[in-house]
Every structure is written in structure tokens, then in C-alpha cells.
Amino acid sequence: LRSYFAKLEYPFGALAIVPSNNKSKIYTANGGELIGQEELLDRVNFLKSNNFKDKVRLTVISNKYDGIDLADSACRLLILDSLPYFENLSDSYEERVRPSGDLIQKKLAQKIEQGLGRSVRGEKDYSVIVLMGNDLVDFVTNTKTKEYFSAETQQQIEIGKTIMSLSKDESFSSDSEFKKH
């Protein structure tokens, strides 16, 4: 799926958030554009102001889960790929010595929720959010860690699980339906 999403060109903004530059390689090898911190503001402004007459490639950013506001057509597809990493020394140390401690679990949930909020900024806004990576999916669906998410996020996760179970009976014989939207 990673290479599939990276190969497409979109008539709207599409964003993948990965926990490290290493995780971005599959996307960039297939056409996704890795955007560094110094280019991020320009890319966000481009996506916000674009009328999408010309299709755009998937924007890939590394370990930036907050501070990006991509409402409306600036982001109609958001991919969160794998469990986030901690950047600061204190959290990184805590994660290594107590990976299942409440504090780390709460901080991970907060970081994931911040990522989920990048594309939907208001009640009339919408986007498709794809969670990838066994570690991330396990974390958000685990009964213990699920309690660290807000009620709204828990509901979104339940809706996603329902959609996934319904879609198991169907398969895309062609990606033309996806490309139409």
C-alpha cells in the first residue's frame, strides 16, 4: 500500500506522516516527496492555496505530528505510518526503560491524536485517514492503550474498524474508483 499511495497523483492534498526519514524511503522511492523542516511552511502554504488544477504527489513528512493545519482540500488523504518516535532525550529514555509505562503510553496517544488532527480542522471538514504499521494499529486498537485517546478519537477508530470489517468482503479489482475521488 505504501508504494501504491506514493505512485498516485492527487487532485487534492495528500500527506503521509512517518516516524523517521528511514521510514520515508518506500514513499520517496515511488514518487512521494519528502519535505524537510525548512521546506515545511512553504509546502503547507502551497497545499492551502492550491486549486489543484494540476495534480500533486504525496507529501511525506518525518516525525512532525503537530503544528500543521491542512484543512479542506489541502489534505483529503492522511496516512499515519507506524508508531511515532520520541525526539527529546527524556521521553526517549523513558520509552526505552519503561515502554509500557502509563506516561509513555499517554504521550504516544497524544502524539497520534495530534497527527490525526492534521487533516480535519472543523466539523464540515473531511478526509480519509489510513493507519499503517502493525505497531500503530496494535496501539490504537489495544483495549488498554485505547483508553488514552479522547472519546472522539475512540469513536473514529471504531468507525474505521467497522468499515474495515465491511470491506473485507469486497476487493478492488481496479483502482479506478479510488482515482475518481
Where are these regions (language model features)?
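Beta-propeller and closely related beta-pinwheel folds
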Residues: 1-3, 33-51, 58
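Conserved beta-strand elements of the Class I
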Residues: 13-17, 33-35, 117
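Short, well-ordered alpha-helical microsegments
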Residues: 24-25, 44, 64, 68
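Short secondary-structure boundary/capping segments
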Residues: 30-35, 74-78, 92-97, 143-152
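Long, largely alpha-helical accessory region at the distal end of helicase-like NTP-driven motors
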Residues: 122-181
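Conserved RecA-like P-loop NTPase helicase motor core
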Residues: 49-139
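Conserved interdomain hinge at the start of the Helicase C-terminal
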Residues: 1-18
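Conserved helicase motor "Helicase C" RecA-like lobe of SF1/SF2 P-loop NTPases
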Residues: 19-38
